Amino acid sequence: MKRIAVFPSGGDAPGMNAAIRAVVRKAISEGMEVYGINRGYAGMVDGDIFPLGSKEVGDKISRGGTFLYSARYPEFAQLEGQLAGIEQLKKHGIEGVVVIGGDGSYHGAMRLTEHGFPAVGIPGTIDNDIAGTDYTIGFDTAVNTAVEAIDKLRDTSSSHGRTFVVEVMGRNAGDIALWAGIASGADQIIVPEEEFDIEKVASTIQYDFEHKGKNHHIIVLAEGVMSGEAFAQKLKEAGDKSDLRVTNLGHILRGGSPTARDRVIASWMGSHAVELLKEGKGGLAVGIHNEELVESPILGTAEEGALFSLTEEGKIIVNNPHKARLDFAALNRSLSQ
C-alpha cells in the first residue's frame, strides 16, 4: 500500500490532531504518501482530499479540535453515498483509509470494508463508549475539563449553601459522569447504567444539609439520563427544598488542549493503524486494553457498543468482554458518606 488517507468524523475530541499527526509521520517514515480529507465522509464524497506532509502536522499535537474539520454525514449510510466516496478515493489513488471517530464513524468504515476498501478505525470520542478499547481519544481530556469546572462550582456552591446539578456529555454512556464525579468528590452521581430513586436523591440532599453539616451538595448527571433542567424539576417535585442550581457543561468538554495521556494514546494508535494498512489489513479497529495495543474487527466493534451495566450487587459489567472497570458506582457511594 503506497497511498493512504486519514480523516476525523462525527463529533470532535481532543487528541484527534495528535492521531492525525501520528498517521502522517508514521506513514511517511514507511515510504507511504498520506492524504487528508476535510469534513469526514462529506468531504470524501465531495472530493475535498489533499496531500499531507510532515510540515502540515508540525504544530498540531497540542491543539484541541481537529484541523481537518469534522462533520456528520448521514447520507453515507446509503449505498449511493458509499460508492461516491469510494470513487473519489480511487480518483486520488488512495488504497486505504484511517478513520478517527465514534460508532457512527465506525459504521462508515465498516461499509467501506464491506465494499472491499481497507479501512482501519481509531476510537476518537469523549464519550468513551466504543467497544474494543479501554479508553477513547478525548475521554481523559473531557474528564479533566469536567473536574476543573466542578471544582469551581463547588466553591460557589459552598459560599451560598446551594445544591448544584452538573450535567455532562456522554451520550448514552455514564463514563464521563462517573470519572469526573469521583475525581471531584461529587455527593451523588446519576448515570444511565444505574436506576435511581428521585425521592432518595432528594432526601439525601436534605440529610446532608441538616444532619451532616454540609454547606453544599454536588450532583453529577450524565446527559443520557435526562437534561439537568428536567432532573431539577423532578427533584423539586420529590420535595427538595434546597437552593438548587443547574449547570450544563455542554460542548466545553470537547474543547481545549489534549492531556498528555490523550496525546500519547492517540500517537500510539495512529502509528499502529498505519502498520496495519501497510500489512494490507483492513476492517479492524485499534484500541488500548490493559495499557497494550489491541485490534478487533470493526464490524463487531461498531455493532456491539461499550456501555456498562450494573448487577444487583452494584458490580459493573462491561458489555465489551475485553474491557475491565472498577466498581466506580459503589466506590463513589462509599466515599460520599
UniProtKB/Swiss-Prot annotation:
Q: What compartments host this protein? A: Cytoplasm
Q: What does this protein do?
A: Catalyzes the phosphorylation of D-fructose 6-phosphate to fructose 1,6-bisphosphate by ATP, the first committing step of glycolysis.
Subunit structure, briefly?
Answer: Homotetramer.
One of the record's GO molecular function terms: AMP binding
The organism is Streptococcus pyogenes serotype M4 (strain MGAS10750)
Positions annotated to bind Mg(2+): 103
Task: Enumerate the Gene3D superfamilies for this protein.
Answer: 3.40.50.450, Phosphofructokinase domain (3.40.50.460)
* Cross-referenced SUPFAM superfamilies: Phosphofructokinase (SSF53784)
Recorded catalytic activity of this chain's protein: beta-D-fructose 6-phosphate + ATP = beta-D-fructose 1,6-bisphosphate + ADP + H(+)
Pathway listed for it is:
Carbohydrate degradation; glycolysis; D-glyceraldehyde 3-phosphate and glycerone phosphate from D-glucose: step 3/4
Q: What are the entry keywords?
A: Allosteric enzyme, ATP-binding, Cytoplasm, Glycolysis, Kinase, Magnesium, Metal-binding, Nucleotide-binding, Transferase
Q: Which residues form the active site?
A: 127
Cofactors (names): Mg(2+)
Q: What is this protein called?
A: ATP-dependent 6-phosphofructokinase
Name where it mostly resides: cytoplasm
